[in-house]
Amino acid sequence: MTARSIKLFFARWKYLMFACCITYLLVIYAPISKSEQKDWKEGEIELSNDHELDVPILQKEELKPQQRPSFEENVPKKKTFNFNPVGKEPFDVEEVLTSSDIKLEERMTATVIPGQKRLILSWNAGHSQDNLQGCPDWNCEFTQVRARAPDADAVLIAHMDNDFVPKPNQYVVYFSQESPANSGIQIPRPDYINMTLGFRHDTPAGSPYGYTVKLGAKSRKTGQVVDANLVNGKAKGAAWFVSHCQTNSKREDFVKKLQKHLQIDIYGGCGPMKCARGDSKCDTMLDTDYHFYVTFENSICEDYVTEKLWKSGYQNTIIPLVLKRKLVEPFVPPNSFIAIDDFKSVKEMGDYLNYLMNNKTAYMEYFEWRHDYKVVFLDGSHHDVLERPWGFCQVCRMAWTEPRQKVLIPNWDAYWRQTCEKDGTLVDSIPLD
């Protein structure tokens, strides 16, 4: 369009354009009538009620940084307990990994009456007052004097003795750290025993060989948690320390099959290699030479996890190999072990283990748990706060409950004898290829 055409356009339509502008301004700036205001407000209220909207309008002063709500402050902090074991570094504990419903706070607290004591009698299970050193402030006395049985709050038995007759309101505690496949007790009636003191977690007096804690925030670790140079120096496959050669689980059969795909050095009475018990060099070579440690149990029973896993498997820089995932997973750190039932065949497992040996980055991922968790090994010879949440201290705690907490194993056979797999069930189910 030329300049002349534009000039003619405005000359012809200028009055109409001026009128349109005036009309527009009147519409925009003219005041709303009272009836219109009422209609508008009613519509707003109706909308608010229909949708239940209640949105506060923040003034400028409410937006100042120091007045903004802190979401971290609103999240309740979990209570932690400080563990200060003898001769070791103290650490804060947020929770213990267990299948039991008894929380850590309950485990760590006893309602003690000043000036009074509670009595624990070992009828034929051994032990001594030293086993209560994890909770000396709970005022429990340990005795092996059978004449004091009528006064005992709890009585430990390792096998039946007809001379012992339980009293009402008295806990009968069965002590055993052996697999149900290799141990047992003949009892006069199915509900004779109140609780067990041993590897089982589903009992108030559970006393495993070790346990895992989730660390409190102050005790968690940052940065590198494993020595990369140590891992890079490893060259061998797996080590196995074993003296029980024929077992219910048939673990020896699986190891023989796996040896076709992975180097497994067998130490002890069941293999050609020797390493004396208690020799520190044995632990050192697990750190420096081997990638994996065989922790297969002699039988597959509920909660049955022994010192093989807790000591050599987790106190060294090595990945433990276990038989069945569901038996150990509730009690150990996440992504910290390898189970044979994770694989479709023996060969598939061997291939994966060889892959980890050749991929140190993937191998080291199995130690990431050390940032947030700690594994405690209970060797049975040192008694301190590490034992407080378990075993004898928990029998002591139960003895202080008022009214006396009712605990009962209603069917002993179902609880003990019927919790093991038939011999070789798992091993026989895994094909070679």
From Swiss-Prot:
Changing N194Q: Loss of catalytic activity. The keyword Transmembrane helix applies. It is a single-pass type II membrane protein. It is found in: Golgi apparatus, Golgi stack membrane. Glycans are attached at N194, N359. Residues 1-12 are cytoplasmic. Its EC number is 2.4.1.214. Its main location: Golgi. Preferentially catalyzes the addition of fucose in alpha 1-3 linkage to the first GlcNAc residue (with or without alpha 1,6-linked fucose), next to the peptide chains in N-glycans. Unlike in mammals, does not require the prior action of N-acetylglucosaminyltransferase I to generate complex N-glycans. Gene3D superfamilies: Glycosyl transferase family 10, C-terminal domain (3.40.50.11660). It is an enzyme of class 2 (transferase). This is Alpha-(1,3)-fucosyltransferase fut-1.
